[in-house]
């Protein structure tokens, strides 16, 4: 893999990544001769690099923006990448008899911004899996947009450890339990609060989500609600 940064500190500041990998996971030999390929380009138009972390815990004094796009492709007997080895999407399981069954192309476009306690980020994902056994193409599409803010930045009576956040996400995917030619749609609406005891290394999260599913095969809609309390410690 190669990576680097160009034009640091200018309006043309950017990072680049390109690599060729084993397409079946870490320490797992390929079943065939094909390798996974990827490229990523990140533009920092304000001349400041933005790390891949959510929430503006460090309170960026200057506005920091990143815009990026990436692509990855692989052909093999697995329909999804897994760090533990060959994986299969629902309805497109790993194939032990055809090493070249799935031709996969996927892309992502993303944007992120941080400034004085405000963090905004969004990603759009697209994936196509061409199945040689059936001659069919299956498309997957999804996106999310989320924002968080430490209101202590405008009201000092609010604890500086508290962040309030909102998230919206959707996924369009083949109906793996019915007709793979039909598309199901899942949506998520989440509001949450984070309490950062010691940055991302020690934090408590409380959130509420409203989840929906539009099932294409049954032509029915389903709804569910979820409340989650999580204490996250990492080191």
Residue ranges, per PLM feature:
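Short loop/turn motifs that connect adjacent beta-strands in outer-membrane beta-barrel proteins
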Residues: 7-14, 27-28, 46-65, 152-162, ...
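Transmembrane beta-strands of outer-membrane beta-barrel proteins
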Residues: 14-18, 65-69, 109, 120-122, ...
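Transmembrane beta-strands of outer-membrane beta-barrel pores
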Residues: 20-24, 45, 71-77, 115-117, ...
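Surface-exposed beta-loop-beta
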Residues: 24-135
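Residues that define the transmembrane beta-barrel architecture of outer-membrane proteins
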Residues: 33-37, 103-107, 137-143, 185-189, ...
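Outer-membrane beta-barrel "beta-signal"
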Residues: 37-48, 147, 223-235
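Outer membrane beta-barrel transmembrane domains
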Residues: 80-88, 148-196, 203-205
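A beta-strand-loop signature enriched in Asp, Gly, Thr, and Trp
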Residues: 102-107, 114-173
């Amino acid at each position: 893999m190669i990576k680097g940064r160009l034009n640091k500190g200018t309006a043309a500041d950017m990072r680049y990544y390109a690599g060729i990998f084993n397409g079946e996971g870490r320490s797992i030999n390929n079943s065939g001769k094909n390798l996974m390929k990827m490229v990523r380009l990140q533009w920092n138009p304000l001349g400041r690099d933005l790390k891949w972390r959510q929430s503006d815990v460090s309170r960026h004094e200057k506005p920091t923006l990143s815009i990026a796009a990436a692509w990855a492709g692989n052909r093999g007997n697995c329909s999804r990448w897994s760090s533990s080895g060959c994986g299969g999407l629902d309805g497109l399981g790993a194939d032990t008899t055809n090493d070249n069954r799935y031709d996969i192309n996927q892309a992502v476009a993303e944007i992120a911004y941080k400034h004085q306690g405000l963090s905004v980020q969004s990603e759009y994902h697209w994936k196509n899996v061409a199945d040689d056994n059936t001659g069919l193409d299956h498309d997957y599409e999804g996106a999310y947009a989320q924002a968080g803010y430490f209101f202590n930045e405008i009201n000092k009576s609010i604890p500086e450890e508290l962040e309030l956040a909102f998230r919206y996400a959707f996924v369009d995917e083949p109906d793996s339990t019915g007709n793979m030619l039909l598309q199901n749609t899942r949506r998520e609406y989440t509001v949450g609060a984070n309490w950062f005891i010691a940055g991302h290394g020690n934090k408590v999260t409380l959130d509420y989500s409203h989840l929906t599913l539009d099932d294409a095969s049954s032509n029915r809609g389903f709804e569910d609600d979820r409340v989650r309390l999580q204490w996250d410690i990492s080191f």
